Structures are given as structure tokens and as C-alpha cells.
């Protein structure tokens, strides 16, 4: 069985920690995301049918402030990728001293095959599903792979 991206990221953290003076409690906290959420987004398509899309939002760590990270629309996105990218976003914000923690979201969809109206309904369904977790003082979503200004 292949090693997950998230397992590889955690392994890099353990290796780096050996060369740094990191409090063991901090290292323990960084092993897993603070919060990972999943939803099935039901969207009415232009032809009247309904389709379900898997979606995720991972808030990795908010020690430095509200979490922030993009929402990826891609047919191969999965929970492992979302958690891994949220993990790395945590460190990217810390390295440049931004007052944010890391987060990432994803929807398993080939957005190129959706009409503008379907894409809008999908985006609204995502926000509705995760609305109680999103906000300027908690989690700040942003565009990512296969998104555009409309999304």
C-alpha cells in the first residue's frame, strides 16, 4: 500500500524537529489537524437531475490566528490531499510570519464540465455546508486549483 501524502508530510516534520528545539507538546499538537470536516454536496444540474459531490475543509492549526487556505476544485482531490495541503499552509504562514494558521478545502469535481450556473450552485452548496466554520475570525477560504473569479 502506498504511503499517504499526509503520512509523508508528518514524517518530514519529525525529521525537521530533530534539528530544531521544538517543544514536544507543540510537536504533538502538529501531528494532526485541529478540525477536518466532510460533506456531500447535493447540486441540481441544468438538466434537472441532482448530483452529489464530496467536499472537505481542514483547519489545521489556529495558534497564530484564523486559518486560511484555498478551496480546490479537482476530480482527484481527496481528504488526504486536503489535510496535507492544510498542514503545509500552516508552515507557509508561520515562515513568513503571517498571523494565520493553515487550512485547505476541496471538492471532488471536474469543474470544466460544469456550466456557469452549476458551478455557482456547487460553490453555494460548499459555503452552506461549511458556513458555521467560515468567517474572518475563524477560517478564511480563498481560490485554488480550477477555480476562477466567479467562484
How would you label these PLM feature ranges?
Residues 1-151:
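N-terminal ligand-binding/catalytic initiation module
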Amino acid at each position: 500500500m502506498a504511503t499517504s501524502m499526509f503520512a509523508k508530510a508528518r514524517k518530514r516534520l519529525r525529521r525537521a524537529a530533530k534539528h530544531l528545539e521544538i517543544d514536544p507538546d507543540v510537536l504533538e499538537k502538529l501531528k494532526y489537524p485541529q478540525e477536518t470536516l466532510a460533506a456531500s454536496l447535493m447540486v441540481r444540474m441544468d438538466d434537472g437531475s441532482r448530483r452529489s459531490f464530496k467536499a472537505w475543509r481542514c483547519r489545521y492549526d489556529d495558534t497564530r490566528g484564523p486559518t486560511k487556505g484555498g478551496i480546490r476544485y479537482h476530480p482527484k482531490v481527496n481528504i488526504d490531499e486536503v489535510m496535507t495541503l492544510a498542514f503545509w499552509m500552516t508552515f507557509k504562514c508561520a515562515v513568513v510570519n503571517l498571523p494565520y494558521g493553515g487550512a485547505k478545502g476541496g471538492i471532488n469535481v471536474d469543474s470544466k464540465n460544469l456550466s456557469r450556473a452549476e458551478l455557482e450552485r456547487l460553490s453555494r452548496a460548499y459555503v452552506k455546508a461549511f458556513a458555521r466554520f467560515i468567517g474572518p475570525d475563524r477560517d478564511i477560504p480563498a481560490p485554488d486549483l480550477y477555480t476562477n473569479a466567479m467562484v
